[in-house]
């Protein structure tokens, strides 16, 4: 009888050990995290692509068109963090819809900017919006919910000044995502929305996620 009880007790102990091992190895063990690859993209926005500071295109068929440089076709990895730097050299045009003066879809819900105040003094800080009347351009990817207004260079800033805007956003799965500027900045076109606003390589582009 004693031997039978001993075997029973030993069996119970073994079962308890197996249950604890199962819980420890499977139930409480979290799967690993797959981190996306950070990617940095550096762009320049200019009033005329033929006279840019960083990536001028003097032989461009439309040298007086506004544009993003050096290109508007951007290739990035899927499910990753994209770090953006945009060197904004153009003056203000203004947004027709003040709602788009706000930042959307970025990491932290803001952007960091170095710029010049009304006295021409350099300033720096994190922002969640700008005065919509002072926007020069925007960087917007509607299908990703990303929208960043780009402040125009203050008229009192030193000649050749640049506002530097940095922010980050996350990509989704593979695909081609259209991006564009929403400021009607195309001079000499109908309502400012023709020409470069509708043309790849200027104020419209593709984000190729793969």
What are these regions (language model features)?
Residues 1-129:
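Extracytoplasmic entry segments of secretory-pathway proteins
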Residues 11, 20-29, 109-126, 130-210:
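Extracellular/periplasmic metallocenter environments
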């Amino acid at each position: 009888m004693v031997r039978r009880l001993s075997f029973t007790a030993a069996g119970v102990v073994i079962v308890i050990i197996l249950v604890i091992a199962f819980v420890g190895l499977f139930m409480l063990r979290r799967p690993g995290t797959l981190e996306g690859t950070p990617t940095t993209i550096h762009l320049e926005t200019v009033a005329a692509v033929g006279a840019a500071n960083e990536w001028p295109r003097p032989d461009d068929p439309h040298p007086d068109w506004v544009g993003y440089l050096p290109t508007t076709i951007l290739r990035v990895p899927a499910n990753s963090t994209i770090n953006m730097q945009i060197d904004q050299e153009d003056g203000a045009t203004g947004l027709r819809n003040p709602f788009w003066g706000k930042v959307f879809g970025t990491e932290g819900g803001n952007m960091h900017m170095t710029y010049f105040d009304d006295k021409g003094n350099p300033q720096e800080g994190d922002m969640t919006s700008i005065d919509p009347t002072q926007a020069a351009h925007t960087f917007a990817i509607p299908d990703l919910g990303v929208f960043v207004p780009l402040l125009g260079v203050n008229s009192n800033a030193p000649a050749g000044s640049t506002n530097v805007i940095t922010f980050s956003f996350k990509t989704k799965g593979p695909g081609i995502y259209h991006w564009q500027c929403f400021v009607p900045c195309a001079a000499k076109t109908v309502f400012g929305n023709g020409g470069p606003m509708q043309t790849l390589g200027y104020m419209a582009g593709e984000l190729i996620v793969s």
